[in-house]
């Protein structure tokens, strides 16, 4: 299997490029949160600081409530691994406006880069996982439009899948392990929720 | 009151959910909720989402609220333990949350495996800052669920209604052969 080449920050910036009021974004805790914030903090971003395992379900609830808006969930491999069943729940509802992009660095990145379950097997004493394939899992859960992105040439299709392709869409993106600056949005959850609702609904 | 002519409490819960404009209902199925789930599934105004684990329901409820919709989570007491960390989301985001919980492991329970979480359920909910309402009389179900929905959606609280085993009835699998 080829090594990952993509860097998460420029990639997320491309995915979110030209985001307007029709794009609602939920990011998982840790790196994905800092990634979308570096691309530009906005009221219609819901960056999570905790609640590991929540983003896909939260995205589904939002997508069902707002069928005319595009809902994009951006999260990491370990976050999704905690809530694999949520993929099957998404598939029961088949939301046409929901896209899920998983940035897979094969690590628990926030806690010292321990190998996650998506790391290869037999990869040395500190870097071995299960070789778990989240795209295959998503497919097996009943999400038909699934893909894995490893190379810069595939990024334009990824952006399209995230932003406009009829959902539910799932893309696994293999990204390199990097030490990056923390770029933090507001932390107060009630504030994040209120500003999101104010921007979307005109009331907190 | 004549049981034949009075409204069934499960039908009354459905009415209350409609009155309060609940648009999404999540559940891990339970026998005690089955009639209510079927009502919701037949309704044109409620989206029913089956879950793989109860904690999904908390995150779904948060997403629905972000999008301007009210929701309710139906689960059994054994599922409450699965939600503990995620239940913190209701406090962190401060969004209205309503859950209706059918109790096991108390009144006349036959299955010893149901007792630990059944007995722990009220304490766990209270520990996570969820208001706990409890009802064991059919005649009080409608008013209790209505009050809980008001506290949640008007008062901005996280509220659980415990539908006690005394209300639901003792689960009985009939004659069984033990081996």
For every predicted segment, state its role:
Chain B
Residues 1-179:
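Thiamine diphosphate
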């Amino acid at each position: 299997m080829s090594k990952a080449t993509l860097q998460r920050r420029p990639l997320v910036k491309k995915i979110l490029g030209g985001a307007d009021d029709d794009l609602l974004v939920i990011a998982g805790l840790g790196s994905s949160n800092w990634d979308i914030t570096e691309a530009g903090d906005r009221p219609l971003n819901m960056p999570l600081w905790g609640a590991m395992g929540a983003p896909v379900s939260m995205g589904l609830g939002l997508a069902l409530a707002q069928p005319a808006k595009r809902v994009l969930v951006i999260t990491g491999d370990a976050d999704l691994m905690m809530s694999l069943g949520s993929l099957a729940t998404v598939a029961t509802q088949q939301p046409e406006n929901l896209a899920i992009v998983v940035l897979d660095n094969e690590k628990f990145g926030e806690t010292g880069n321990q190998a996650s379950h998506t790391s290869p097997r037999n990869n040395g004493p500190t870097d071995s996982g299960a070789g778990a394939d989240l795209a295959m899992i998503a497919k097996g859960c009943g999400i038909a439009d699934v893909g894995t992105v490893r190379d810069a040439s595939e990024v334009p299709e990824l952006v399209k899948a995230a932003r406009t392709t009829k959902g539910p869409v799932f893309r696994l993106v293999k990204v390199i392990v990097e030490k990056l600056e923390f770029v933090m949005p507001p932390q107060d959850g009630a504030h994040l929720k209120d500003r999101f609702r104010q921007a979307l609904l005109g009331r907190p | 009151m004549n049981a034949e002519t009075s409204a069934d409490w499960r039908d009354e819960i459905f009415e209350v959910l409609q009155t309060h404009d609940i648009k999404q209902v999540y559940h891990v199925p339970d026998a005690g909720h089955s009639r209510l789930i079927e009502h919701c599934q037949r309704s044109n105004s409620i989206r029913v989402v089956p879950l793989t684990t109860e904690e999904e329901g908390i995150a779904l409820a948060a997403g629905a609220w972000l999008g301007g919709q009210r929701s309710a989570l139906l689960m059994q007491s054994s599922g409450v333990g699965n939600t503990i960390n995620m239940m913190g989301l209701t406090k962190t985001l401060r969004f209205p949350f309503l859950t209706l919980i059918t109790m096991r492991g108390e009144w006349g329970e036959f299955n010893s495996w149901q007792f630990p979480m059944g007995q722990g359920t009220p304490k766990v909910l209270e520990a996570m800052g969820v208001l706990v309402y409890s009802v064991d009389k059919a005649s009080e179900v409608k008013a209790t669920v209505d009050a809980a929905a008001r506290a949640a959606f008007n008062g901005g609280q996280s509220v659980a209604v415990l539908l006690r085993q005394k209300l639901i009835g003792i689960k009985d699998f009939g004659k069984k052969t033990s081996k």
